[in-house]
Amino acid sequence: MDPVRLYYSYNDIHKMCAQQAEKILETFRPDVIIAIGGGGFIPARILRTFLKKKGSKNIPIQAIGLSLYEELVSDSPEEVPGLEVKRTQWLDFSTLGMVDLVGKNILIVDEVDDTRTTLHYALRELQRDVAEQAKKLNREGEKTTFGIFVVHNKVKPKNAQLDKEILDKYYFTGCNTPDCWIMYPWEAQDIEEHDSHVAKMGDLKP
């Protein structure tokens, strides 16, 4: 039996980002967005539009690449969870003009919180990097706060955990879903076919 699939359109994602941006501005106010590629890139860019305050500069977006999912060896476009997280791209703190993360509110963005393994890894490594930079710069007294935004959170047992403060205060999700395949428009090879599935689902999806 095929797994249940939930199809979401670009409009769906846009609206979820807009709704959550209000909550993020009320409680977190990020200085920097870090998008986990590739699923976090589009949500991060949409989110930045709604987080921009009038008269202020755009919030900078930095990118990291992590791989946990592996493509199935078949004609299917679906992916299955891998066994470990692998870095494919990371922040270079030595790069000229690199955004300073010490003492900032940093919002990590991804498309889905599935097993939570990727988010846990990203948060742990970024916390470690910021702590090292704070020590080098003699700024260990400055508090750096992390938040997380995901378009979807799958309601299921997780393989890893996040800091309690983040879960209680700074964890934002556009929608909670059951444990099923989530079909995003940026993964579609035929966007018209994808949108037809979205239309057929109507209000059935969360």
Curated annotation (Swiss-Prot):
**KW Isomerase (keyword) present:** no
GO MF terms here are: guanine phosphoribosyltransferase activity; hypoxanthine phosphoribosyltransferase activity; metal ion binding; nucleotide binding; pentosyltransferase activity; xanthine phosphoribosyltransferase activity
Task: Tell me the cofactor note.
Answer: The magnesium ions are essentially bound to the substrate and have few direct interactions with the protein.
Please provide an example of a Pfam family that matches this protein in its UniProt record.
Pribosyltran
* Principal place of residence: endoplasmic reticulum
Q: Name one GO biological process term.
A: XMP salvage
Q: Can you tell me which residues the record assigns to a coiled coil? A: none
What are the protein's UniProt keywords? Answer: Endoplasmic reticulum, Glycosyltransferase, Magnesium, Metal-binding, Nucleotide-binding, Purine salvage, Transferase
Provide the protein's localization: Endoplasmic reticulum
Give the GO cellular component terms, alphabetically. Answer: cytoplasm; endoplasmic reticulum; nucleus
Q: Which cofactor does it need?
A: Mg(2+)
Q: Where is the active site?
A: 114
Q: Which family does it belong to?
A: Belongs to the purine/pyrimidine phosphoribosyltransferase family.
Q: How does it assemble?
A: Dimer.
Question: Which protein are we looking at?
Answer: Hypoxanthine-guanine phosphoribosyltransferase
- Name its species: Schizosaccharomyces pombe (strain 972 / ATCC 24843)
